[in-house]
Structures are given as C-alpha cells and as structure tokens.
Amino acid sequence: DHAAELAVDPDGYSLWGGSAGARMAAALGRRDALAQLGVARVGQAAAVVTQYTGYTGTAPDDAPTYACVGSRDGIAAPQAMRRRLQRLESYGIPTEFHVYEGLTHGFGLGSGTAAAGWVRAAVSFWEAQMKERRRAA
C-alpha cells in the first residue's frame, strides 16, 4: 500500500533471510503466498536470498533463489540446501548456490571471512532476475 511513498518497486523486490528467516523468505517467495495472506496487490518476489537454512519445500512457482551456507554448518547442512536448489532447477527456476569453506552457522555479512562479498553476489543475482523479468514482460 505504500510502494510509491517508499520508492519500492512491487514487481522487483526480493525477500532475504538467514536461518529461520530464510525459511520464511523462501515460503513467501512462492507465487501465491502473499495473496493467501491477504496481500493481493503485491506480485511475486523477483528473487529470494537465503542463508543457512534447512528449509526443504519446493514448488514449480517458487521464486528464483540465491543461497549460501558455510561448509561446517551443523544446523543447515550444505547438502540439504544443494538438494533443494537442484529441485528448483528441475522446475526451470534460476538458482545460485555458494558454500563457504570453513564457516559455521550464522556468518552474517561475512566480513573478513571466506564469505566476504556474498551480499554483492546476491544483489547481482537479484538484479539479473529483475532484468529477466522486465525482458519477459
């Protein structure tokens, strides 16, 4: 309801989350998820960006997804995240996945770690999805 006031593009937004927040972002990235919650005037996210989540749900109408995790994450196994993205890819959904060597759960922005720069990579993925969405429109 406040997209113009906040200078937000309701057709080009992304959903971001880490750990439990990534579960929420991924679930809300499904095409009709927001409409089911009564937010009918907002289209699907252009991209979902998730960090270290054990969320495994997939559907053919999920949003393009960027994901990253540490190789030593004892809560969100990199293999489980990889399998989820492979299922999304099988639906033709664009994905990008990064495993950062030696990192555990909760590396945040990754400053000073193997994950340094992941935020810029995620933004680039999101921008590519917005560009593709505009091209296809």
Can you annotate each of these PLM segments?
Residues R31-A33, R83-R87, A116:
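Glycine-rich, phosphate-binding/catalytic loops in enzymes
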Residues A26, P78-R82, A116:
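Short, surface-exposed alpha-helical segments at coil->helix boundaries
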Residues A63, A77-R87:
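Short alpha-helix in the alpha/beta-hydrolase fold that links the catalytic acid
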Residues C68, E89-A137:
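C-terminal catalytic histidine-bearing segment of alpha/beta-hydrolase fold enzymes
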Residues Y13, T65, T95:
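Hydrophobic anchor at the start of a short beta-strand
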